[in-house]
Swiss-Prot record:
<feature type="binding site">
    <location>
        <position position="10"/>
    </location>
    <ligand>
        <name>NADPH</name>
    </ligand>
</feature>
<feature type="binding site">
    <location>
        <position position="36"/>
    </location>
    <ligand>
        <name>NADPH</name>
    </ligand>
</feature>
<keyword id="KW-0464">Manganese</keyword>
<comment type="similarity">
    <text>Belongs to the DXR family.</text>
</comment>
<dbReference type="GO" id="GO:0070402">
    <property type="term" value="F:NADPH binding"/>
</dbReference>
<dbReference type="Pfam" id="PF13288">
    <property type="entry name" value="DXPR_C"/>
</dbReference>
<feature type="binding site">
    <location>
        <position position="217"/>
    </location>
    <ligand>
        <name>1-deoxy-D-xylulose 5-phosphate</name>
    </ligand>
</feature>
<feature type="binding site">
    <location>
        <position position="221"/>
    </location>
    <ligand>
        <name>Mn(2+)</name>
    </ligand>
</feature>
<feature type="binding site">
    <location>
        <position position="212"/>
    </location>
    <ligand>
        <name>1-deoxy-D-xylulose 5-phosphate</name>
    </ligand>
</feature>
<dbReference type="InterPro" id="IPR026877">
    <property type="entry name" value="DXPR_C"/>
</dbReference>
<dbReference type="InterPro" id="IPR003821">
    <property type="entry name" value="DXP_reductoisomerase"/>
</dbReference>
<dbReference type="Pfam" id="PF02670">
    <property type="entry name" value="DXP_reductoisom"/>
</dbReference>
<feature type="binding site">
    <location>
        <position position="199"/>
    </location>
    <ligand>
        <name>1-deoxy-D-xylulose 5-phosphate</name>
    </ligand>
</feature>
<feature type="binding site">
    <location>
        <position position="126"/>
    </location>
    <ligand>
        <name>NADPH</name>
    </ligand>
</feature>
<dbReference type="InterPro" id="IPR013644">
    <property type="entry name" value="DXP_reductoisomerase_C"/>
</dbReference>
<dbReference type="GO" id="GO:0030145">
    <property type="term" value="F:manganese ion binding"/>
</dbReference>
<dbReference type="Pfam" id="PF08436">
    <property type="entry name" value="DXP_redisom_C"/>
</dbReference>
Length: 390
């Protein structure tokens, strides 16, 4: 029985992780839950899974949460604020922490979990994108496992099992192409928030769905793959695969190509991250190749997806530049979701912020440097819009 804590328990990653726990009560026990604002769903999760410790990031909702569970026959530890989330991350009884918090907000709790000796099921890619130079040495120092829990990096990780050192030649990340994969470039200026949120294959949160539409999600995954697998950016490719059946591939030195296939279902990579190196039986629908039909591929259009090139450039620049890219993207996507900028403004804003940061970048940033760069980039997005409206 593995004891786990879940950061972001009411979001897409968190609820699907809890589905896994429900399906496998003999394998996993929830000891900690943390979320941002959704106290109604959190209270229901507390009733069902009876964690030992919970946290709500929004401190103003603490008393309301306590009231919602006041009739329980047990009393979990209930905390609030960023420090409360960090306490859940490093809570003593948990063996593994699922990091499902969206964005750079997941960085400090993940670091707290690592320094407390917890294995990490990494569903928060921003942890490595922004904090890779700091996080990876901590993983090595504290001898914990950092296991990818998103579909693409889990696919790569699975394909690499048994590949000898030096055998890997190239990583190939597959992308659905997002909501606008079949839309002509000239029609992008007219797209709305509602249009961008219509992902053709995956059910995900709002922010990551927009990232999929811009292909920034895949660009961020390139940076994450670089850190996770130690592969040069020149050896990481992106290919559009509309069916989302092949979750990613690796090419070996002898030109053999290995791939991991399955229906688009986030539960599979989450389960593997929690159960590795075991393979746990499930009654989920297996992939039927005949039902899936044809699998198609095409090169991504760099004119249509400029965010992809911005991510490669930030990754190659290194230092704190990926943190700046990530923060600028988070802010730009939030503004788009609020209908304050257009869809095409997202890459324009990001490029401006990254260009302005270039002279400030350092090759070996500390955690404080990374956090400062993150804060700077968020403010700079506002400055860009005030000084030079996009």
């Amino acid at each position: 029985m593995k004891k786990i804590s879940i950061l972001g328990s009411t979001g897409s990653i968190g609820t699907q992780t809890l589905d896994i726990v429900t399906d496998h009560p003999d394998k996993f026990q929830v000891v900690g839950l943390a979320t941002g604002n959704n106290i109604q769903l959190l209270s229901e999760q507390i009733r069902q899974f009876r964690p030992q410790i919970v946290a709500i990031n929004n401190e103003s909702q603490l008393e309301d949460l306590k009231s919602l569970i006041s009739d329980l026959d047990y009393t979990p530890i209930i905390l609030a604020g960023k420090e409360g989330v960090i306490e859940v991350a490093r809570y003593g009884d948990s063996e593994s922490v699922v990091t499902g918090i969206v964005g750079c907000a997941g960085l400090l709790p993940t670091i707290a979990a690592i320094t407390a000796g917890k294995d990490i099921a990494l569903a928060n890619k921003e942890t490595l994108i922004a904090g890779g130079p700091v996080v990876l040495p901590l993983v090595e120092k504290h001898r914990v496992k950092l296991l990818p829990a998103d579909s693409e990096h889990s696919a790569i990780f699975q394909c690499l099992q048994g590949v000898p050192t030096g055998g890997l030649k190239k990583i190939i990340l597959t992308a659905s192409g997002g909501a606008f994969r079949d839309l002509p470039v000239e029609k992008l200026p007219q797209v709305t928030v509602a249009d961008a949120l219509k992902h053709p294959n995956w059910s995900m949160g709002r922010k990551i769905t927009i990232d999929s539409a811009t292909l920034m999600n895949k660009g961020l995954e390139v940076i994450e793959a670089h850190y996770l697998f130690g592969v040069d950016y020149n050896a990481i490719d992106i290919v559009i695969h509309p069916q989302s059946i092949i979750h990613s591939l690796i090419e070996l030195q002898d030109t053999s190509v290995l791939a991991q296939l399955g229906w688009p279902d986030m539960r599979l990579p989450l389960l593997y991250a929690l159960s590795w190196p075991e393979r746990i039986y499930t009654d989920w629908e297996p992939l039927n190749l005949v039902k899936a039909g044809s699998l198609t591929f095409k090169e991504p259009d760099h004119q249509k997806y400029p965010c992809m090139g911005l991510a490669y450039a930030a990754g190659r620049a290194g230092g704190a530049m990926p943190a700046v890219l990530n923060a600028a993207n988070e802010q730009a996507v939030a503004l788009f979701l609020e209908e304050k900028i257009s869809f095409l403004d997202i890459p324009r804003v990001i490029e401006k912020v990254c260009d302005r940061f270039a002279i400030h970048n350092t090759s070996t940033p500390s955690l404080d440097d990374i956090l400062a760069a993150d804060n700077w980039a968020r403010q700079e997005v506002s400055n860009c819009l005030i000084a030079n409206p996009v």
